[in-house]
Amino acid sequence: MSLIQVSNLSFTYDGSFQPVFENVNMQLDTAWRLGFIGRNGRGKTTFLKLLLGELHYQGSIHASVGFSYFPYPVKDSSQLALYVLESICPDFLYWQLLREMNLLGVPEEILYQPYNTLSNGEQTKLQLAVLFLRENQFLLIDEPTNHLDMLGRTLVSRYLRTKSGFILVSHDRAFLDGCIDHILSINKANIEVQKGNYSSWWENKQRQDAFELEENRKLQKEITRLQETAREKAQWSDRVEATKIGQGPCDRGYIGHKAAKMMARSKAIAGRREAAIAEKSKLLKNIERADSLKIFQLPYHQSTLVRLQNVTISYGERTVCRDISFEIRPGDRICLQGPNGSGKSSLLRLILGEAIPHTGEVRIGSGVRLSYVSQSTLGLGGSLRDLARDQGVEESLLLSMLAKLGMAKTQTEKDLESLSDGQKKKVLLAVSICQKTHLHIWDEPLNFMDVISRTQLEELLLTFKPTILFVEHDKMFCEHIANKTVTLG
């Protein structure tokens, strides 16, 4: 058995007073298939960089294996894909690469195409295939699902299940359940390792949270009772002491003795109260705040907001989708599904009014207001105040929404460009949620989003039932939210 030993690990970014990690100790087995979870901004990618030795830290990290990071930085993406893979792992055997590619459903011919002409999903699969051919390496896999469709996620999850020796950062619950045997979670107050998959971790967390909340309630009730009892005893003792004036020596001695006993009892009660307070302070440290969100959608009083009739989208000679017909009515939560390249994002942008080459008919209802969230966070920068003003939402409302999504005030005061991808996605979603609109159009809204925030979004959409058209590859989210599905390809 080979171990990764982390001892007294502490790290703080330059210019920050808040440590990301403080005196962290853990042992990780290099044979584990380890899922790595935690709210956005907690330090998952930072921890991977510490393992890679890219950041200076206090403490020690000892390992008998090397670390390889996904996604691997490609210097010249114009090369043939085969040459790019050779730069990642120079000594792989060709037949071994083909074996791995076959497991991932990737055809051999794409090796002889320029790497930058491949889809993001194809690039993901090729990189994983070749990285697992590197010997004596422990893979650090950082959010591989962001560019994978639902079928691709299923294939990669099954593939990873056949491997061992990796840390996998992902927020896709079904994907994690399909391939991991341990969970590493960054909680509010600590970092912990558990055996099992995501679902078993979540069940344990829910059980622990419920237990701590009930214990907290009992202790608070006991503290209140003890405080009241101590107050009554102290008041009685004071009254009795006052009656000693004018009494005879025997009476005063008796009364004083009784008052002393009562005072001793009062001190004992105070001690029990302090013990209860100390016990209470140990609870609730890892309970995540997941406040309910509210959405501000306007009612629409016509029967149809959007109608597509026999829509075909083509780029030159390449047709990406053909003869698509559907309607969006008030209350519809439509999931647009299909493999990568089937025209889902193009169809959304067509509805938004972009000049997408197409035939067929697209009708938008009179006065329909749309709110759009792109799958990409590129280009987001500047201050939150300026963004709120430009998007026509109240800054205080936006700040409140982001706080409920787990973003600290210090994070919202930064230049948006400096935020993590998950935090940027929360900003974009929060803006959309705050906008007064008739129809929300969200393109892969869960990219980079942590699990707690995903469940908050699910609760929001199921509670307020807004009209929404969305593209998403998170299987659980689609099953929970969609009341209609349109399949392309």
Please give the residue ranges for each predicted region.
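Flexible nucleotide-interacting loop at or near the entrance of a catalytic core
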Residues: 2-4, 212-319
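ABC ATP-binding cassette signature C-motif
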Residues: 1-216, 296, 300-489
